[in-house]
């Protein structure tokens, strides 16, 4: 059943998107390997090697989704971002992600606002070395925010989440699903005694002042009742006030759907980061005296 739902989700995303033509330019030492694949053997140096994506079709004040597949050896931290001029100053917004050993899908979102001459790019932070490959790069204008914007929230073919910080690096895993009503995989969060566990969306997700964010997901505990929480986190660099919306809930031994809604404030003078049009989704297990584990599945994020 989940496989059918996955296909339906991708079909809905395709129907709600407007393809945008892009020109891809790999800068050395990135190499074009053919068939839309680009590779690099990154040495960890302070060179920020990049792939540039340009388009004459990117419009202001629109949301765009960059989809691609990636794989990597090592622990290199790759960035994907959008840069351009805004109000006479250079403005750059980026997302950091890390690929695994096998090709997996990624979906990243950007809000162009009033950005002039925008350029999308990949580059790599100095640090861990590794071999990295990306392929099937595609840029779409997101025409309908009412569809699910987390196509890999079912964890069957990819994972739209990563540990919230290095502290939680070992608390997240994708495992065989424990009797979920569809599909074969679920996300597992595992916490030690007197500790918590938390993941966040890899992508910044669209958030429109005056509109309502709807988050849906299923959860079950491995044993007993575990306190869980979710944040809609609007905190962005360069802004003084940090808006976030917390939700608390209990995770029981049986699968239960959790549905949460939040009307995004329109006061962009107080909460200036809302002008960026983006937020992150965070899901976690609360810090308690007991160790525990919980499973998450069917995560959806949309705007109405």
Give the label of every model feature segment.
Residues 1-5:
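Positively charged n-region of N-terminal signal peptides that target proteins for export
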Residues 6-9, 24-26:
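Short helix-onset patch at the extreme N-terminus, typifying the N->h transition
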Residues 8-18:
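Hydrophobic h-region of N-terminal signal peptides that target proteins for export
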Residues 19-304:
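Extracellular and organelle-lumenal recognition/adhesion modules and their flexible linkers in secreted
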């Amino acid at each position: 059943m989940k496989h059918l739902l996955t296909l339906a989700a991708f079909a809905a995303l395709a129907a709600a998107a407007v393809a945008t033509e892009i020109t891809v330019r790999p800068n050395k030492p990135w190499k074009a390997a053919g068939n839309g694949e680009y590779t690099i053997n990154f040495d960890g140096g302070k060179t920020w090697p990049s792939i540039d994506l340009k388009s004459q079709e990117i419009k202001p004040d629109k949301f765009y989704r960059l989809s691609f597949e990636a794989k990597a050896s090592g622990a290199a931290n790759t960035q994907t971002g959008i840069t351009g001029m805004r109000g006479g100053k250079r403005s750059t917004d980026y997302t950091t992600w890390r690929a695994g050993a096998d090709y997996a899908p990624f979906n990243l979102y950007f809000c162009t606002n009033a950005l002039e001459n925008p350029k999308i790019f990949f580059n790599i932070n100095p640090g861990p070395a590794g071999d990295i490959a990306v392929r099937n790069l595609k840029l779409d204008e997101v025409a309908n925010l009412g569809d699910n914007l987390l196509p890999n929230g079912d964890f069957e073919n990819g994972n739209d989440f990563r540990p919230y910080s290095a502290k939680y690096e070992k608390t997240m895993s994708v495992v065989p699903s424990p009797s979920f009503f569809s599909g074969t995989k679920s996300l597992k969060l595992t916490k030690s005694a007197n500790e918590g566990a938390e993941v966040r969306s890899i992508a910044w997700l669209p958030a429109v002042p005056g509109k309502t964010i709807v988050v849906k997901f299923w959860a079950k505990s491995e044993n007993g009742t575990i306190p869980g929480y979710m944040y809609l986190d609007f905190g962005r660099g360069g802004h003084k006030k940090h808006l976030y919306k917390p939700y608390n809930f209990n995770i029981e031994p049986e699968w239960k759907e959790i549905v949460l809604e939040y009307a995004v404030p329109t006061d962009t003078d107080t909460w200036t980061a809302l002008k960026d049009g983006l937020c992150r989704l965070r899901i976690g297990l609360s810090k308690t005296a007991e160790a525990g584990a919980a499973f998450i599945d069917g995560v959806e994020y949309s705007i109405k």
